[in-house]
Amino acid sequence: PNNNIDDIVPPPQHSTWEKYYSKDIQLSHGQITDIMGKLESDSNFLVFGLGYDSKMWANGANVDGRTLFIENSKEWIEKIQKHSPNLDIRHLDYESDMREAFSVYFEHEDKLMESFPAYLKNTKWDVILVDAPMGGGGLGNPGRMKPIYWASQIIRRTGHVFVHDAERAIESRFSKRYLEENLGRKPFVVDKGTIGGQRKLVYYAPVSTQLSAANASVIQPI
């Protein structure tokens, strides 16, 4: 008999995206796994933000779908394209200031739709990750008011929305207003595998899957 366990048990199979995972990424491996797990082979995935994790997102299971990145920094686009020239990236000037989040944009949908790129309406989006633009630090940063509202307008009824840095006031209040109250989606904190310094990720589940989401071990209801 063959007593070599390596010949009996097949080696673990890793997803393609895991080759591009780095501990420098601000989402935990468990959080990323949960997002990637929502992608079907034909899913369309919209990512607000561009970074060293972008090649990883572009290698999800949606091989027959599309992964699009929206980024407001031309310098950052140029930097990433040097290493990953085949990424589908669109530059966008949000024309917003996070200091005006609640005085100008909150519950003013006409202002939130300013600078909305019409091409986003041409695709049925199955998964959306809001991880940009800059919403902390410098006072002149655009904030994530618009991407959160846009996500509420273009996500499929059965689609999945994730908002990163959700502990911050803008992300929290705009998500509650436009994803939770307007769409009836229930928020769940995705906290699997988080370590110190990694920020809050909230999953806004489609109404049809809220029961299964609530029973999942990966996420905890707010």
Set out the residue ranges of the language-model regions.
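A short acidic, Gly/Pro-enriched loop at the edge of an enzyme's catalytic core
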Residues: L120-V127
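C-terminal substrate-binding/active-site "lid" region of AdoMet-derived donor-dependent transferases
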Residues: P133-I222
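Structural motif
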Residues: L46, V127-D131, F162
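A Trp-anchored, charged/polar loop motif used as the substrate-binding/catalytic surface
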Residues: V104-Y119
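Glycine-rich phosphate-binding "P-loop"
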Residues: P10-G30, D34-S43, A132-G140
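SAM cofactor-binding core of SAM-dependent methyltransferases
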Residues: S28-E100
